[in-house]
Amino acid sequence: MKIGVFDSGVGGFSVLKSLLKAQIFDEIIYYGDSARVPYGTKDPTTIKQFGLEALDFFKPHQIKLLIVACNTASALALEEMQKHSKIPIVGVIEPSILAIKQQVKDKNAPILVLGTKATIQSNAYDNALKQQGYLNVSHLATSLFVPLIEESILEGELLETCMRYYFTPLEILPEVVILGCTHFPLIAQKIEGYFMEHFALSTPPLLIHSGDAIVGYLQQKYALKKNACAFPKVEFHASGDVVWLEKQAKEWLKL
């Protein structure tokens, strides 16, 4: 099966990596809207328009399924995109909630949602979690992580300062952290390490990774089996510099 993966930039590589590892599709067309990243600081109307324009991009490629790997677009544009599409479109929020249902049985477990400003303000995760009975939910807009990751700053003083700025004021330590932006799994180990070191935790919080979550979701929904296909062919496209995007993909995905 030939599918598409849409993201605002390189963050969707975290989803793509999980898809490549699972080998459940034959061919993947990746489109990064890198000329307009970040999405998280833009208004909902603009994000919806970006989503519809992404649909126009994919039409000539004749894909059978589209994955919206961007949490911000999933929160604010997914419904509009689905209305204008004849093929199934899957976002990353519903799979993440399903992963929590499967892994977190304590409905009172403190859950922290990390995301861009736009994703957090949409309340998409908060509302979905409450519908499943999880009421001890807090959220934190951590938009500064996005430009750091886009610049391949995945460790070091700048990232440490950014984590300190966001996480020091936390009053309740989470047992579950939703990485509510597909950029964030690229610094997941650093986030986990920060919580362990600075809050003296005996065990790390459970990190919900949208890439792993969406593979599980797709397997369940479409009865797909891991390793059913050969290693997928991947084709990269971008609204900005596609050469730069391909270079980042080779470095991060080891292609």
Curated annotation (Swiss-Prot):
Q: Which UniProt keywords apply?
A: Cell shape, Cell wall biogenesis/degradation, Isomerase, Peptidoglycan synthesis
User: Per the UniProt entry, what is one GO biological process?
Assistant: peptidoglycan biosynthetic process
Enzyme Commission number, as recorded: 5.1.1.3
Pathway field: Cell wall biogenesis; peptidoglycan biosynthesis
Q: Which reaction does it catalyse?
A: L-glutamate = D-glutamate
Drop me one GO molecular function for this one. Answer: glutamate racemase activity
**Binding-site list for substrate:** D7, S8, Y39, G40, N71, T72, T182, H183
Q: What class of enzyme is it?
A: isomerase
Highest rank taxon of the organism: Bacteria
The positions flagged as active site in the entry are C70, C181
Return the similarity comment. Answer: Belongs to the aspartate/glutamate racemases family.
Question: What job does this protein perform?
Answer: Provides the (R)-glutamate required for cell wall biosynthesis.
Q: Please report the name of this protein according to its UniProt entry.
A: Glutamate racemase
Q: What is the lineage of its organism?
A: Bacteria, Pseudomonadati, Campylobacterota, Epsilonproteobacteria, Campylobacterales
